[in-house]
Curated annotation (Swiss-Prot):
MF GO annotations: NADH dehydrogenase (ubiquinone) activity; ubiquinone binding
Superkingdom in the source lineage: Bacteria
EC number of this enzyme: 7.1.1.-
PANTHER family (alphabetical): NAD(P)H-QUINONE OXIDOREDUCTASE CHAIN 4, CHLOROPLASTIC, NADH-UBIQUINONE OXIDOREDUCTASE CHAIN 4
Gene name in the database record: ndhD2
NCBIfam families attached to this UniProt entry: NDH_I_M (TIGR01972), PRK02546.1 (NF002713), PRK12561.1 (NF009212)
Function field: NDH-1 shuttles electrons from NAD(P)H, via FMN and iron-sulfur (Fe-S) centers, to quinones in the respiratory chain. The immediate electron acceptor for the enzyme in this species is believed to be plastoquinone. Couples the redox reaction to proton translocation (for every two electrons transferred, four hydrogen ions are translocated across the cytoplasmic membrane), and thus conserves the redox energy in a proton gradient.
GO terms under cellular component: plasma membrane-derived thylakoid membrane
Keywords: Membrane, NAD, NADP, Plastoquinone, Quinone, Thylakoid, Translocase, Transmembrane, Transmembrane helix
Protein name as catalogued: NAD(P)H-quinone oxidoreductase chain 4 2
Length: 526
C-alpha cells in the first residue's frame, strides 16, 4: 500500500481530539471504561506517529516532510498547513510517547474521570499541532488551545492553591501570547504579499530594526513557556498544585513548546536578530542554570524543588541554540528531548511518593526507602539521570552544549571561559541538591509514624512499567545518542549554517546553504 499521500499529520492531530468528543457518550460508573478508552486512543495515535515516522520521514532531508496544505481563507493565504522536519519530528514522537504514559499515570484519578481524560486527549492533539503547523495564525490558535485544558486540569484537580496557580499560569501565558499574535499579523501583512505561511514569511526582508522588535516580543512569549528567568515564576506554582499526569505533560511537553518556537521562529525566521541576541540568550541561559539550581537547593517542598530543577536544565537549551555551532544546536535539541523524559519520570515519582505519604515536605519524609525497595530504586535511577550521570541522556546533551559553546568562534575566548565556568557551577550544584533530596526522602531521619503506616506499600506493576518505559530511552540515548541526533541533524546543521551567515564576526567565513522553498511548500489543494 502506498502511504506517500496519506494525511499523516492531520490524522495524528485530529484523531485524539475527535475521539475525545465521544467520551461523554461512554456509559461508565466507576471510570474504568473511560480509562481504557483514553489509553487505547493514546496508544493508537502513538502507533500512527511511529508509522508515519518510519514510512514517510527521511533523516537526510533538512526540509519539511509529510507536508499537507489546504486553502482555508484564500484572500490572506490562510491555510491548514502542516509538516515535519528535524525540529518538529522528534518532539512529535516525544509528545505521543509521554502523553500515552501520562494517561496511564492518571489511573488513580477518580474525580470526574470523563472530563479529565477529555482534557488529556485535547492536549494530546493540541500539543502535536503546535509542533506540526506551518502557518503563523494557525500556530497562534494551537498555542492558545493548550491554555484551556491546562487551566482546567490545574483548577479542578490541583491542590489547595490550585486556583491561584491556574490563574497565574493563564495570565502569564495569555499575556505572552499577545506578542505572538502581534508578531504574526505584522509579519503576515509586511511587504507586498499577505501570507501567514512560515516559509514565505522567512523569505521576507524585515530590516534589522523590525527584526529586533519582533524577536524581542517573541522571546518574551516563548520565554514564558521555556521558561526563562524572570518569566519563570508561574512554573513552581503550577507544579506545586498539579497532579502527576499534569506534571508529566508540563515538564515533558509544555516547556519544550517554548524551546521549539525559539528555534523555529526566532532563529529560523529572524536570523539576523537571533545573531545579535545571541549573547543575551547565553547570559539568560547561565542565569537559568545557576539561579534555579541555587533556588532548588533551598526548597523544602518536593514538587517545587523538581520544578526549579527543570528551569535550571532548560538553561542549556538557550546556550546551545545561541552557540552558532552544529554541536551546540544539536545539544539544545537533545536536551529538550532528554529533559522531557527525565522531567516526566521525576514528577511521576513525586506523584507516586505523595500517593503513599500524603506530604510533599521533605522534613516530614524520611526512611521510606527502607520499606519500599522498588520506589527506592526508581527514585535513585531517575535522580541519577537528572544529575547527568554518564551513560544517560542528560550527560550527552549537556556535554554537547558545553563543547559546542566552548568551541564557538562567534564569541571571544574570555566570554566563553566565563560562561562555561558559570554553567559548570550549576552542573556541580545539581548533584548536591538531588542527592540531599534523596537522602531526606529515602533514608532519614526516619519518620516512624510514616514508615509504620499500612498504606506505605511498594510500587505496583503499573508504576514500575511507566518508569521502565521512561528509563529505557534515557539510558538508550545516553549509550547511543546517534539514534536520536540523526533524526534532526540535517535540519539543525542547515539552520546553524544560515545563522552563522548572520553573525557579524563570521559573515566572511560562513556559507549558508540555500533553502529550496518549493520543497518546503506543499502543492495547493482546493
Amino acid at each position: 500500500m502506498n502511504f506517500a499521500n496519506f494525511p499523516w499529520l492531520s490524522t495524528i492531530i485530529l484523531f485524539p481530539i475527535i475521539a475525545a468528543l465521544f467520551l461523554p457518550l461512554i456509559p461508565d460508573k466507576d471510570g474504568k471504561t473511560v480509562r481504557w478508552y483514553a489509553l487505547t486512543i493514546g496508544l493508537i495515535d502513538f502507533v500512527i506517529i511511529v508509522t508515519a515516522f518510519y514510512t514517510g520521514y527521511d533523516f537526510g532531508n533538512p526540509n519539511l516532510q509529510l507536508v499537507e496544505s489546504y486553502t482555508w481563507v484564500e484572500a490572506i493565504d490562510l491555510r491548514w498547513s502542516v509538516g515535519a522536519d528535524g525540529l518538529s519530528m522528534p518532539l512529535i514522537l516525544l509528545t505521543g510517547f509521554i502523553t500515552t504514559l501520562a494517561i496511564l499515570a492518571a489511573w488513580p484519578v477518580s474525580f470526574k474521570p470523563k472530563l479529565f481524560y477529555f482534557l488529556m486527549l485535547l492536549m494530546y492533539g493540541g500539543q502535536i499541532a503546535v509542533f506540526a503547523v506551518q502557518d503563523m495564525l494557525l500556530f497562534f490558535f494551537t498555542w492558545e488551545l493548550e491554555l484551556v485544558p491546562v487551566y482546567l486540569i490545574l483548577s479542578i484537580w490541583g491542590g489547595k492553591k490550585r486556583l491561584y496557580a491556574a490563574t497565574k499560569f493563564i495570565l502569564y501565558t495569555a499575556g505572552g501570547s499577545l506578542f505572538i499574535l502581534i508578531a504574526a499579523l505584522t509579519m503576515a501583512f509586511y511587504g507586498d504579499t499577505v501570507t501567514f505561511d512560515m516559509t514565505a514569511i522567512a523569505q521576507k526582508d524585515f530590516g534589522i530594526n523590525l527584526q529586533l522588535l519582533l524577536y524581542g516580543g517573541l522571546l518574551i512569549a516563548y520565554g514564558v513557556k521555556l521558561p526563562i528567568f524572570p518569566l519563570h515564576t508561574w512554573l513552581p506554582d503550577a507544579h506545586g498544585e498539579a497532579t502527576a499526569p499534569a506534571h508529566m505533560l508540563l515538564a515533558g511537553i509544555l516547556l519544550k513548546m517554548g524551546g521549539y518556537a525559539l528555534l523555529r521562529m526566532n532563529a529560523g525566521m529572524l536570523p539576523d536578530a537571533h545573531a545579535l541576541f545571541g549573547p543575551v540568550l547565553v547570559i539568560l541561559g547561565v542565569v537559568n542554570i545557576v539561579y534555579a539550581a541555587l533556588t532548588s537547593f533551598a526548597q523544602r517542598n518536593l514538587k517545587r524543588k523538581i520544578a526549579y530543577s527543570s528551569i535550571s536544565h532548560m538553561g542549556f537549551v538557550l546556550i546551545g541554540m545561541a552557540s552558532f555551532t552544529d554541536l551546540g544546536t544539536s545539544g539544545a535539541m537533545l536536551q529538550m528531548i532528554s529533559h522531557g523524559l527525565i522531567g516526566a519520570s521525576l514528577f511521576f515519582m513525586v506523584g507516586a511518593t505523595y500517593d503513599r505519604t500524603h506530604t510533599l515536605m521533605l522534613d516530614e519524609m524520611g526512611g521510606v526507602g527502607k520499606k519500599m525497595k522498588k520506589i527506592f530504586a526508581m527514585w535513585t535511577t531517575c535522580s541519577m539521570a537528572s544529575l547527568a550521570l554518564p551513560g544517560m541522556s542528560g550527560f550527552v546533551a549537556e556535554l554537547m552544549v558545553f563543547v559546542g559553546f566552548a568551541t564557538s568562534d562567534a564569541y571571544s575566548p574570555t566570554f566563553r571561559v566565563i560562561i562555561v565556568f558559570l554553567a559548570a557551577v550549576g552542573v556541580i550544584l545539581t548533584p548536591i541538591y538531588l542527592l540531599s533530596m534523596l537522602r531526606e526522602i529515602l533514608y532519614g531521619p526516619e519518620n516512624k509514624e510514616l514508615v509504620a503506616h499500612e498504606k506505605l506499600i511498594d510500587a505496583e506493576p503499573r508504576e514500575v512499567f511507566v518508569i521502565a518505559c521512561l528509563l529505557i530511552p534515557i539510558i538508550g540515548i545516553g549509550l547511543y545518542p546517534k539514534a536520536v541526533t540523526q533524526i534532526y541533524a540535517s535540519t539543525t546543521e542547515n539552520l546553524t549554517a544560515i545563522l552563522r551567515q548572520s553573525v557579524p564576526s563570521l559573515q566572511q567565513t560562513a556559507q549558508a546553504p540555500s533553502l529550496d522553498v518549493a520543497v518546503l511548500r506543499a502543492p495547493e489543494i482546493r
